[in-house]
Amino acid sequence: MDIASFIGLFGGFAIIIFGAVLGGSARGLFHVPSLLITVGGSYLTLFLTYPLSYAVGVFRVIARVFHAADFHEREIVQRLYALAEKSRRTGLLALEEEIQDFDDDFVRTGLRNVVDGVDGDAIKALMESELTHMEDRHNTWISLLNSWAALAPGYGMLGTVMGLIGMLATLEDKSSLGSNMATALITTFYGSLVQNWFITPVATKLQYQHDLEVKSKEMVIEGVLSIQAGDHPRVLAQRLLTYLSPKMRKELEMELIKD
């Protein structure tokens, strides 16, 4: 669970409501027609701009921001270091029994190719190709969210224009002025809210998680190729530690790279 995402989501909403309460306008913030125009309209436009599977699946992707992005870099470095030691002692074929212990298919596939005697350049090409396809998928989802964020204020302005038209058309009916004015103003608020409070932050968080995963997989590629090349375990460790945070790097240096 990513506590920061929950703090950002609910804390931001609470601040908005608290400010509205202090300003005496909290009751006017909820307006169903404006909500339908802004949120519903901008979301349904995604069905026009993206395939059905993406428009429907966007909420599943949004849910990922509430799960902590942990790619187990420390464990991967430790285990690849141990495999490098074992391969130097007993040969690459001895790694076969260790492969299935990895939960990550990306790591397993790379190590399987090493054990099978696949050329290093071929292994690198295969793993980088898989990484590229993953990046393409992730970038499509992030692009979808950015599109939604861009659409929401536009629908907010559309609702504002609709409200103004209704207000101008019924100026003689004083009883409808308040409702039409509310629609005119609140849709702009909803458009800005959807964009700045929710969709754009979610897209940014997913981009951050994506960058972490790419870096993690690049580290795996480096480690697998180092094992395939028969590098000394210390050399492998020094290469992989460059991908880690300074704190984690220092801890693993003390553990793996000994005098």
From Swiss-Prot:
Keyword annotations of the record: Cell inner membrane, Cell membrane, Chemotaxis, Flagellar rotation, Hydrogen ion transport, Ion transport, Membrane, Transmembrane, Transmembrane helix, Transport
Pfam families noted in UniProt: MotA_ExbB
Record has Nucleotide-binding as a keyword: no
Record localization: Cell inner membrane
A single cellular component GO annotation: plasma membrane
Superkingdom assignment: Bacteria
GO BP terms: bacterial-type flagellum-dependent swarming motility; chemotaxis; proton transmembrane transport
Main subcellular location: membrane
Residue spans crossing the bilayer: 3-23, 28-48, 148-168, 184-204
Signal sequence region: none
UniProt cross-references to InterPro entries, sorted A to Z: Flag_MotA_CS, MotA-like, MotA_ExbB_proton_chnl
Topology Cytoplasmic: residue spans: 205-259
Topology with respect to the bilayer: Multi-pass membrane protein
Keyword Nucleotide-binding appears in the UniProt entry: no
Family indicated by similarity: Belongs to the MotA family.
Free-text function comment from the UniProt entry: MotA and MotB comprise the stator element of the flagellar motor complex. Required for rotation of the flagellar motor. Probable transmembrane proton channel.
Subunit note: Each stator complex is composed of 4 MotA and 2 MotB subunits. 2 A subunits and 1 B subunit are thought to form a single ion channel, so that each stator complex contains two channels.
Listed name of the protein: Motility protein A
The species this protein was found in: Treponema pallidum (strain Nichols)
Name of encoding gene: motA
